[in-house]
């Protein structure tokens, strides 16, 4: 039996499946600069007591990350409040409250460190649709796939530098998502100019089904 008042245990609800639409004009929650480990994404320590409560532990999401758009670790700029500094998970919750999905931009070996599954579950819970990086740590990339987040890598690593704070990102032609087929990503700048870049993925046919179902567990449930 679980008590609703518990702040350590809560039932998990299945993540929603992909709705069949492209990801259009996603805001950038974070542009991670340099090393971003699973501990930067989901810190341990005092937070471990909330491992059984996804909503509670999600309050630590990316609080250890260095954001290229902020001078304060774990912070970003709040577009809902004149770009004032705000903790990254607090902005994620504002997006969540307004039904706005978002993405993350990352540097090299994104998600290195311990194989912390919460480092994928928390962003997914808060509304992350995709993460685009120069390169992934293998286990973190696998965990993102399992929980329905689209993990992409820049075809040209220098495209990381093109991403600006107020950009909106669109990932298009998702209905054509297939093994070994790169995806087109459109960067829309605040001045109404745009650039199109190419991103790669390593999704297998089975993992593409995970993405469409919303998670690996959802896909498994569909087979029962």
What are these regions (language model features)?
Residues 1-224:
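Fe-S-dependent hydro-lyases/dehydratases of central metabolism
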């Amino acid at each position: 039996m679980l008590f609703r008042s518990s702040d350590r245990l809560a039932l998990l609800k299945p993540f929603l499946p992909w709705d069949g639409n492209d990801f259009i004009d996603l805001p950038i929650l974070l542009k991670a600069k340099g090393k971003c480990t699973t501990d930067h994404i989901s810190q341990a320590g005092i937070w471990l007591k909330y491992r059984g409560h996804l909503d509670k532990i999600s309050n630590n999401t990316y609080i250890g990350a260095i954001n290229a758009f902020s001078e304060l670790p774990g912070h970003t700029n709040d577009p809902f409040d004149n770009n004032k500094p705000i903790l990254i998970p607090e902005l994620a919750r504002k997006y969540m409250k307004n039904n706005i999905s978002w993405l993350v931009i990352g540097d090299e070996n994104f998600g290195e460190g311990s194989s912390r599954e919460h480092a994928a579950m928390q962003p997914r819970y808060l509304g992350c649709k995709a993460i685009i990086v120069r390169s992934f740590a293998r286990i973190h990339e696998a965990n993102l796939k399992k929980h329905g987040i689209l993990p992409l890598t820049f075809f040209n690593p220098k495209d990381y530098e093109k991403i600006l704070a107020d950009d909106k990102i669109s990932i298009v032609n998702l209905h054509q998502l297939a093994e070994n087929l790169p995806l087109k990503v459109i960067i829309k700048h605040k001045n109404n100019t745009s650039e199109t870049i190419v991103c790669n993925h390593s999704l297998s046919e089975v993992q593409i089904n995970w993405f469409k179902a919303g998670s690996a567990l959802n896909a498994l449930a569909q087979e029962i």
